[in-house]
Every structure is written in C-alpha cells, then in structure tokens.
Amino acid sequence: MPKRSCPFADVAPLQLKVRVSQRELSRGVCAERYSQEVFEKTKRLLFLGAQAYLDHVWDEGCAVVHLPESPKPGPTGAPRAARGQMLIGPDGRLIRSLGQASEADPSGVASIACSSCVRAVDGKAVCGQCERALCGQCVRTCWGCGSVACTLCGLVDCSDMYEKVLCTSCAMFET
C-alpha cells in the first residue's frame, strides 16, 4: 500500500537554508536601488575625473607647440613624392613625419637599433611603409617600385623561380 501524503504540505513552507548574497539582492528585491547607487557613483567618479583633468590642463596654461613646417618645393620646383606616413600640420597641410625628415637630412640622426634584428644602425635606412630604422642586412628593396621595406612590411612572392620582395603598395596590384 502506498504511503499517505502529508495533509499539511500546502500550508507548511520548506525549511531549507537559503544563502542570500549581494548578487541576489542586486538582482531581486533591491535591484532598482542598487542599480541607482551604482549609476550615481559611476557618474560622480566620471565627473570628478574630468574635473581633475581639466584643472590640471588649465593650471599648465596654454603652451604653444612648435611643429615643423610643411615641406617646401625643392630646387626643381616639384615636391618630393609623398610616401609613407604623413602628418596633418597645424595649418591643415600634410607634413613629413620624423622618419622621412631624417631620411632627407641624416646629419642630426643619432645611432639607434634596427627594428628587425636590434643591431646598431647609422639611421640612413628607414622603411618606406612603417618608418622603422633598418640595418644593412635587414633592408629589402621592393621589386615593383624600388622603395625600402622592412621584414614586417615587405611581402615575399615565391611564385616565380626567384623570390620577389614587394612593398604593401605594390602587393595590392600583383595577382
């Protein structure tokens, strides 16, 4: 014969230990209050951070930054081809970045390390794409346009009998 069911099952609640943590409170009964507190605290921290930054900026005053002039035409009257990274000057015109300026005037360049093999270089070879300094062993010349490329920017085409190094500009047009 089966056991008879408890006549008080619907009336008596289950007596289980329930652990209520911060997570249950923030998702359940107190969800609205906790989310409002978090929102207010976040907003207050953002405004305090922005105010501290602005106070720091205004305390320094307005400093005038002297940037190099835009490139002037050479003696032939035609500007040099703009290859590699260019920057927008304060007047809105494009200016050469430091790597291209040092390529044009190598007299003020200090001895630095090669970006590929970390050997000391004299600063004359600079990648035409990313403007990293290169030593003599790491210089790769593009088969298409003849520009200098580093090991990261130079793509090696092994489809022919001989390997061809292509810069990223020329690699777009090769099929």
Curated annotation (Swiss-Prot):
It comes from the Eukaryota. One of its GO terms (cellular component) is mitochondrion. The modification Phosphoserine is found at residue 70. Keywords: Apoptosis, Cytoplasm, Host-virus interaction, Metal-binding, Nucleus, Pharmaceutical, Phosphoprotein, Zinc. Residues 105-123 are annotated as: Interaction with coxsackievirus B3 VP2. Phosphorylated by ABL2/ARG in response to oxidative stress. Residues 36-55 are annotated as: Interaction with BCL2L1 isoform Bcl-x(L) and inhibition of BCL2L1 anti-apoptotic activity. Ubiquitous. Mostly expressed in thymus, testis, ovary, prostate, small intestine and spleen and less in colon. One of its GO terms (molecular function) is CD27 receptor binding. InterPro entries: Siva (IPR022773). Its main location: cytoplasm. It is found in: Cytoplasm; Nucleus. The modification Phosphotyrosine is found at residue 34. Binds through its N-terminal region to the C-terminus of CD27 and to PXMP2/PMP22. Binds to the C-terminus of TNFRSF18/GITR. Isoform 1 binds to BCL2L1/BCLX isoform Bcl-x(L) but not to BAX. Induces CD27-mediated apoptosis. Inhibits BCL2L1 isoform Bcl-x(L) anti-apoptotic activity. Inhibits activation of NF-kappa-B and promotes T-cell receptor-mediated apoptosis. This is Apoptosis regulatory protein Siva. The lineage of its organism: Eukaryota, Metazoa, Chordata, Craniata, Vertebrata.
